[in-house]
Amino acid sequence: TRIFEAWSDEPWVNDGAAVRVSLVAFGDSQKEAVLDGATAAHIHADLTAASADGDSMDLPSAKPLLANKASCFVGTSKKASFDIPGDLARSWLALPNPHGQSNAEVVKPWINGSDLVKAPSDTWIVDFGVERPQAEAALFDAPFEYVQRVVKPEKDAVRSESERRKWWLHARTALDMRKALTGTERFMVTSIVAKHRVWVWRPTIVLASHAVCVVARADD
C-alpha cells in the first residue's frame, strides 16, 4: 500500500476551532501521486515528497544515531497546581527556614511549550525533587504550606494511590532527566507540540515540564 494523494495542512471545517488537519488517501492505487495539488514521485509518511529524480529526505525512515542515545528527555509531570506566579516565588526566596536552607532549592523557574513559542509567562514551580521525605519538605516553610493548602486537596482526589500518598511530589519526577543534567550548566529544549521546531537554551536551574523535550547537552 502507498499514499497516492494527500493534503498536508488544511483548516478544520468547524468555525472557531484552532485546528489544522492533514488528509491522506492510501491504498493499492497505481495512480500518480499528488501532494497538495502538485505531482510527486513519492509521498513519504511525514507528507513530504520525493522529487521527480527521486531525490528526497525520507525522515520517517531515518535511523537513530548512537551518539544521541539517552540524551533527550521529557520533563516532569506535576498533575496538580505546583506552579506559582514569579512575584510570589521571588518573595519566598528571601524567607528564612528552620534548617537554614534557601527556598531556591525547591522553588524554580518553570518552562512549558508556550514559554518557547510565545512570550515567557514568568511561571515558577514548587519542586521537592524525586524522593525527598515529607518531613524534610516541611522544613521549607512557605513552599510546603502552599503545597499542603493548595496541592494536597487536588492530590487527595486522584485515582493513583502513589500520587495520593506522595502528594508533595510531582506525579512524574523525571529522574532520568535530572540525572542526565547533573553537572551541566544549561540544556537545549523544544516544545513537543508546535507547528515550528524552535530550540532554546535554558540554564539548569529551570525545571522543564512534560510539554517539552530536554536535550541534556551543553555543547554548541
Predicted regions and their residues:
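Flexible, glycine/threonine-enriched loop-and-boundary segments that flank and lead into catalytic domains
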Residues: A142, Y146-C213
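Catalytic nucleotidyltransferase
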Residues: F128-G129, F140
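Short, flexible beta-strand-to-coil junctions
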Residues: N112-L116, I192-H196, R217-D219
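Signature of N6-adenine DNA methyltransferases within the class I
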Residues: T1-E105, K118-T123, P133-A138, W199-C213, ...
